[in-house]
Amino acid sequence: MANTTSAKKATRKIARRTAVNKSRRTQMRGAVRNVEEAIKTGDRAAAVKALANAEPALMRAAQRNIIHKNNASRKVSRLTAQIAKLAK
């Protein structure tokens, strides 16, 4: 339990930040899930459109330190490669 006033304030700030980050992470995961579902159905046009929404969501999450930059880049790269396979 926090004893000092500053520690109590820090605890409140952490709780607020955690809630915001959780929301952003959920939104990011949903965007990625939409791409994966479009890939599973084999709909290339829908997958490309979903990726256009997912890529900025991933990069924003990386920029705000919700996920690591390399993690975001890796996810975008892998999703792009899967979409490229659909074209063949």
UniProtKB/Swiss-Prot annotation:
Coiled coil, from the record: none
Top-level division of the source organism's lineage: Bacteria
Official protein name in the record: Small ribosomal subunit protein bS20
Gene3D superfamilies: Ribosomal protein S20
GO molecular function: small ribosomal subunit rRNA binding; structural constituent of ribosome
Alphabetical list of InterPro entries matching this protein: Ribosomal_bS20, Ribosomal_bS20_sf
Organism whose genome encodes this protein: Bradyrhizobium diazoefficiens (strain JCM 10833 / BCRC 13528 / IAM 13628 / NBRC 14792 / USDA 110)
Family under the similarity heading: Belongs to the bacterial ribosomal protein bS20 family.
Entry keywords, A to Z: Ribonucleoprotein, Ribosomal protein, RNA-binding, rRNA-binding
NCBIfam families cross-referenced by the UniProt entry: S20
Gene Ontology cellular-component terms listed: cytosol; small ribosomal subunit
Function recorded in the entry: Binds directly to 16S ribosomal RNA.
